[in-house]
């Protein structure tokens, strides 16, 4: 058996099934939010974990998961983020989306590509760059944002959140341009 990937930070997940999946894939400790009604005691746990070992927020690639990510991120600054593409988190019968459905390989890959929040960073990528790239409004915008989020490993979001994440994770103009070029090439096929 291969040596298990050891994670120093404490991983914030949504529930027990996510913890089981994480521990199956890597050697790590978790904090469970148990849904999107996050109690103050959970926020306090996450704050303490952030001070002692650091925190990686690893929630499901769906609306409740993004909501939980935002709540924790707002209340506990400086967290790291791991993202799982939606198609790697689908249940076998396509009923449900979650980390608990992901393969060990997908979980490890997401944890190898974590992003760190940077406070008060004015990024290189402007709102007009997103508009010019067809990522805001228009019939191709959603699918382009999905692809860009996957290529840049920052998850799928709406246009406003995409802009915020590009800033927060200090995505360079070069990385953005490379990903955009790939999206356009794929569309031509």
Swiss-Prot record:
Where is this protein found? Cytoplasm
- A molecular-function term among this protein's GO annotations: metal ion binding
* GO CC terms in record: cytoplasm
Keyword Metal-binding in annotation? yes
* Recorded catalytic activity of this chain's protein: Endonucleolytic cleavage of RNA, removing 21 and 42 nucleotides, respectively, from the 5'- and 3'-termini of a 5S-rRNA precursor
Q: Which InterPro entries match?
A: RNase_M5, RNase_M5_C, TOPRIM_dom, TOPRIM_RNase_M5-like
Q: What is its EC number?
A: 3.1.26.8
The residues the record assigns to binding Mg(2+) 1 are 14, 60
Q: Please share the entry's free-text remark on the cofactor.
A: Binds two Mg(2+) per subunit.
**Keyword vocabulary terms for this entry:** Cytoplasm, Endonuclease, Hydrolase, Magnesium, Metal-binding, Nuclease, Ribosome biogenesis, RNA-binding, rRNA processing, rRNA-binding
Required cofactors, per record?
A: Mg(2+)
Q: SUPFAM superfamilies of this UniProt entry?
A: Toprim domain (SSF110455)
Gene3D superfamilies linked to this entry: 3.40.1360.10
Described purpose of this protein according to its UniProt entry: Required for correct processing of both the 5' and 3' ends of 5S rRNA precursor. Cleaves both sides of a double-stranded region yielding mature 5S rRNA in one step.
HAMAP family from the UniProt entry: RNase_M5
In the record, the note on similarity to other proteins reads: Belongs to the ribonuclease M5 family.
Q: What is this protein called?
A: Ribonuclease M5
